[in-house]
Amino acid sequence: MNKDPVSEERAAAELLLARAAEQERAGDWPAAAGTLQEVLGRWPGLADTWYNLARMQRRCGEPEAALASYARALELGLDGPEEAHLNRGVIYADDLQCAELAQIELQRALALNPNYLPAWMNLANLHEDRGEREAARLAYERALALQPDHPETLARLTNASIIDRADDPLISRLRAALASTGTEWTQRAELGFALGRALDAVGEYAEAWRAYRTANSASRMSALAAGARYDRSAYARYVDALIAAFPAAAATQAPGETTPGRLQSQSVAPSPSPQPIFICGMFRSGSTLVEQILAAHPQVRRGGELPLLPAIVQEHFQPYPQACRSLDAARISAAATAYLQGIKRIHPGAQYITDKRPDNFHHIGLIKAMFPQARIVHTHRNALDNALSIWFLHLDHAMAYATDLGDITHHIREYQRLMRHWHTVYSQDLIDVDYESLVRSPETEVRRLLDALELPWEPACLEFYRQRSLVKTASVWQVREPLHRRSVGRWQNYATELEPWRQALTEAPV
């Protein structure tokens, strides 16, 4: 019996596609991309396969390749082309920081399908990131019209609005939605955080606290259901391991000695070009504000919260931080080169690029091994204000400590312990920026910061809020305003509620 060549080809393609799907489920995205490329090498006309290849390429950190693959899928007549345009828009906005091209792609998606809710949500979010409040609000309203009972849309519309009176209709809508949401934890969290923010804005502090408590409880249940929890003992052991991997003795030890954490040859790291400016500190400590100030300088380009350093840790330094107790020149050089290639892709030709990932304070020792001349900006603020600001935000499950004030307090104290160690080891290379001092005496503090970074004075740094570039953090609206003191001492509105944690948060500062 003769075999049907068409059936054989189809079976071969299906086998490879099944393998790629299994590789994706296993999280092996490079392997999945390789298998999909093998499929397309034999059957290049498969639009869906080009689409899936684009998804894998983006996950592999290849945004330009992903854009090209999405374009090929569109050329081949992909079903649901609005999804490809949406994904191209996300790449332009999140990976390449090209807001104009992102908006074009999102508008193309909406031209194909005016009722495509994800495109309206992403367009609204893009307007938020650009500081275009009214455009963001209108886009969220359009999205809400498509799905009036969508909790996330109502919450985001509230967050993009200026709430200045207690009878604002949005507050009533949030109360009603929260009362009818039932036990859907994610929805209750979204609505509760938005209601808390609105009530706080109009001075209804007691009800705001209750709304935030409901929101954090729901967020915590959602995190636990996803397997995310904050382990205080495990985090303390992690800080212990970081301190052991980069001991104070290594900073002053003579070359050739073998103290853990000392690079065998500190001359191997390539000269940074462009030069990274690392900005880190506790989340919600003013790091976005400092980045916005620096990005107003003509020699500095904004990098945002780059994933580069955590990716390098994952690839080159496992188990971390134990692997850093014995660093070799070749590994450090490879890591530094990979990092520099990553920031060059984001801003080719830039002289300085900011890397504002707050939790990079864990990696200060590794940063100094990769870039011995690096200056690291460390932002900090009043711990009570800091803790409250964290508790008031709906954060990713990766920050599992953020839903419980006891966990937040523990995390802050461990962060303070680690920063005291880094100050001992690298006292000349850490530039501390105190939020309260910055808003009280902005020109003095900005001049001090620029001097420490060996950058010339630039008056535009005091008018940072005039920039129209993308800002993709929870502080998106605050950094669009001139410096103000409204957030200083905010904890006093909730002094009674914060009393159980007050002593722990006010002792042993950085």
What do the predicted segments below correspond to?
Residues 12, 46, 80-81, 116, ...:
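Residue-level recognition of tetratricopeptide repeat
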Residues 25-38, 60-72, 83, 94-108, ...:
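Structural signature of tandem alpha-helical TPR/SEL1-like repeats
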Residues 15, 49, 83-84, 119, ...:
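TPR alpha-solenoid repeat register
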Residues 139, 158, 171-182, 192-273, ...:
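PAPS-dependent sulfotransferases, especially Golgi type II membrane carbohydrate sulfotransferases
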Residues 261, 267-369:
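Phosphate-binding active sites in nucleotide-utilizing proteins
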Residues 43, 77-78, 96, 113, ...:
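A structural motif in tetratricopeptide-repeat
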